[in-house]
Amino acid sequence: MIFDFRDLWTENINFKGLFPFNVYEQLQEYRWCRLADVITTVSEPLARVLEKKHHKKVQIVLNGFDPEDRMNNKQVEKLDSSKINILYTGTIYRGFQNPSPLFEALKSLIEDDYPGISDLLITFAGKNTTEAEKLAEKYGVQSQVNCLGFLKRETILSLQECADILLFLDYNSENGDGILTGKLYEYMFSGTRIWTIGKVNRASRIIEENDLGEVYGNDVEKIKEALKVLLVEKHPGKFSLELLTEKLRHYTRGYQAQRMLDCLNQN
């Protein structure tokens, strides 16, 4: 039997559970881990948490992405082509993910009346975009922030491909290092360059190691300089999906499915 953790269960930083159910869940996690022939999870940091807790070897099987989801996507959506578009897709987890450094950099350029800054548009699509709206108002940049709310996946995939930059918000938490969401892999196979903001965790390092974008942490000055370069470039070049599929083949779901089978066959 394989016990697979796509996210941590009772150690999940986004949801700690409710008493008394969390006590029952702790017991269930211990029980199933004890019975499992193989325990798997999505990253080395999460594996270390589980190994320390359950005293068993934990194998790594990534979430991955199926490139055919893009190849077969017939949905065609466009962002405003008159703008330089930075796009974030997905949920923003309050207290863990924060676009404030980007807004602060944008505010500074607006106050400097930097040439072309009015051409920049930052779009958020997904659940809880109200958090982005509130922060945009706080920094006075709401006129250049667009929140679309929840959209179907086919639409999101299309928008990711036509954006000029994809914004990835890494977790500002010591416990966020091993969180590798499916959204990360969607971004990686989009063909669009990625900017990561937040504490530099494993997700940001994967983007940097594969030369898929830039990692800025929470450094407002670096983000400000990157925005200046973007205003000159306007529309950076794209990566070919065919080349990405070859370069990132070990991040595909097919590769990871085989990895799961290998873990099972070893026991």
Question: What function would you assign to each model-found segment?
Answer:
Residues N218-K222, V232-Q266:
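A charged, aromatic-enriched C-terminal amphipathic alpha-helix characteristic of glycosyltransferases
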Residues P45, G64:
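Carbohydrate-associated surface elements
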Residues F65-K83:
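Acidic anion/phosphate-binding donor-loop and adjacent secondary structure
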Residues F19-I39:
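Membrane-proximal helix-turn-helix segments that form the acceptor-binding/catalytic region
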Residues I117-G126, E131-T155:
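Nucleotide-activated donor-binding/catalytic signature segment of Leloir-type glycosyltransferases, i.e.
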Residues Q97-S100, K152-S158, L166-M188, I194-R205:
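Nucleotide-sugar-dependent
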Residues K78-F96, F103-L106, Q256:
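Conserved donor-binding/catalytic core segment of Leloir-type glycosyltransferases
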